[in-house]
Amino acid sequence: MSQYQNQYGAQTGMTDEYGNPVNQVDQYGNPISGGGGLTGEAGRQHYGTTGGATGQGHGHGQQHRGVDQTTGYGTHTGGVGGYGTKPEYGSTNTGSGYGTGTGYGGSGTNPDYGSTNTGSGYGTGTGYGGSGTTEYVREEHHGDKKGVMDKIKEKIPGTEQSRTNTDGTGYGSTGQGYVREQQHGTGYGSTGQGYVREQQDVHHGDEQHGEKKGIMEKIKEKLPGTGACTGH
């Protein structure tokens, strides 16, 4: 009996005030058996990556005669963490804008063509002067006066019928070459000069039947060798 009393006495310290056995718990709330009972270790299962809720420990204590067996089931189930399925994709920005604007300038079709007369103005200035005229003058003086030139010719030796052959240098009209000037063309026409030989054949047949003579006629009479030219 004493053995049983010692056992019961030892067990009385593990009962509450009503005689019910008291289950001792650890710092996590899991029951600890005081006798030869088996204490089940709370199994912990954690799911998810975020912090889950605190687990709930359900302890079921059953006391049998002579056997203090406490089986604790700790089902500490953590909350399942949500999966971050929001990938933020940056825009690839593969829009390659092709600036293929090849601006073609309008071809300049406004060439200023200078005159093809590259300074060679064609002034074929062959100016032809008036052709020399041969004048036959027959003067018959039936009056008193003679001209001045007639009187001089009478006093010159051998000029009874003096044939004057004057080689004059008659200048023809200057030929002007007209150059058609287009844009920026400068053509110069050379002025041509034509030389004309004038030949004048003057034949004087003088018949004088007057009385008075002019001044030049008197001068001619005074010249030597001219007495045969005049007659009174």
Swiss-Prot record:
Alphabetized UniProt keyword annotations: Stress response
Family in the record: Belongs to the plant dehydrin family.
Lineage: Eukaryota, Viridiplantae, Streptophyta, Embryophyta, Tracheophyta
Region (Disordered): 1-66, 140-232
InterPro entries: Dehydrin (IPR000167), Dehydrin_CS (IPR030513)
UniProt biased composition (Polar residues): 1-14, 159-168
Leader peptide range in chain numbering: none
The protein's name: Dehydrin DHN3
Family annotation (PROSITE patterns): DEHYDRIN_2
Start-end of Gly residues biased regions: 49-60
Species of the source: Pisum sativum
Induction: By abscisic acid (ABA) and water stress.
Residues that span the membrane, as ranges: none
One annotated GO biological process: response to water deprivation
Compositional bias (Basic and acidic residues): 140-157, 198-223
Record carries keyword Cell division: no
Gene Ontology, cellular component aspect: cytosol
Source organism superkingdom: Eukaryota
